[in-house]
Amino acid sequence: MFDIAPVSRERDEQIQACIDDKTKPRGALGALEPLAAHLARLLGEAPEIGRPAMLVFAADHGIASAGVSIAPPEVTGQMVANFAAGGAAINVFCRQLGWQLEIIDAGMLSAPPREMGVTDCRLGAGTGPIHKRAAMTLGQVEHGLAFGRERVRSHHAEGTNLIGLGEMGIGNTSSAAAVMAALMGLEAKDCVGRGTGVDAATLKRKQMLVEQALLLHLDMLTSPESVLACVGGFEIVEMTGAILGAAELGIPVLVDGFIATTAALAAVKMFPQSREYLIFAHRSAERAHGLMLAHMEAEPLLSLDMRLGEGTGAALALPLVQAAANFYREMASFSDAGITDVTP
């Protein structure tokens, strides 16, 4: 379904030489230097971030009705209305930092009014309760991957060469934990966290329900696609499709926190070469996030103890990505500036 080329390493020596010849001691820009090299591989000799687009996928989860969150299921729709009105954290950050923001209904309980301006990519009215039955069908997974790819292609046609991913969905940390456990061969207790900030009793119930879901679907968890069908979320599936669609186009993706990283994990399990197109924005306060980052050998750009979702961490990482591209493209070399290179 996806045709993803591995990233060429033919220019690596040339790229590193370019970075080392900038008017600075070698390595003095720290983590910005490998980030700049990564962008030069993906975007060419003069990398420049054009029209960055933040895609926020919203969906509801059947497991939310079992009381795994501090918020009831209807809050998903209420927050999407807040996004549409421009009042959420992701709106503030996108306005400040120059992101193009698109809100996408991947499968909320109720479709928002057309005048709200939310893109319709609905796969259903929320997933099935994963502790009782499958979240969705394999056909819905296929359609969701295609929806995610199509949204990326639409932005790319307008000049976008960097995609940010965010999400909204009450109950989605439970689904994400189940997906993570199934894809990494872990137990529920290793993957379930406090999400929206639940108390100890709710955390115990959440862990029990995720364990129940994994046991119920054990014989079906044989591929990334079947894992998504059994225990995933509509927004997780569509983010996975967006990642694969961006990789297919050869453009990088800024991955947000725990939920978005679960989609990244699914994408990498489907197409390992898609890993090379991912930039991980921040380390979430959600405990299990670090396990996924380590599994994918990822070092995030930021660590701010955030756990909001919405794409907020990815949004805040944009200036660092721009700075890496800009210094690679604009910073003078020693010879250009007439400075003696004393680097040993």
Swiss-Prot record:
Keywords: Cobalamin biosynthesis, Glycosyltransferase, Transferase. It catalyses: 5,6-dimethylbenzimidazole + nicotinate beta-D-ribonucleotide = alpha-ribazole 5'-phosphate + nicotinate + H(+). HAMAP family: CobT. SUPFAM superfamilies: Nicotinate mononucleotide:5,6-dimethylbenzimidazole phosphoribosyltransferase (CobT). Belongs to the CobT family. Catalyzes the synthesis of alpha-ribazole-5'-phosphate from nicotinate mononucleotide (NAMN) and 5,6-dimethylbenzimidazole (DMB). Pathway: Nucleoside biosynthesis; alpha-ribazole biosynthesis; alpha-ribazole from 5,6-dimethylbenzimidazole: step 1/2. Transmembrane segments: none annotated. Its EC number is 2.4.2.21. The active site is at E310 (proton acceptor). This is Nicotinate-nucleotide--dimethylbenzimidazole phosphoribosyltransferase. GO terms for biological process: cobalamin biosynthetic process. InterPro entries: Nict_dMeBzImd_PRibTrfase, Nict_dMeBzImd_PRibTrfase_bact, Nict_dMeBzImd_PRibTrfase_N, Nict_dMeBzImd_PRibTrfase_sf. NCBIfam families: cobT_DBIPRT (TIGR03160), PRK00105.1 (NF000996). GO terms for molecular function: nicotinate-nucleotide-dimethylbenzimidazole phosphoribosyltransferase activity.
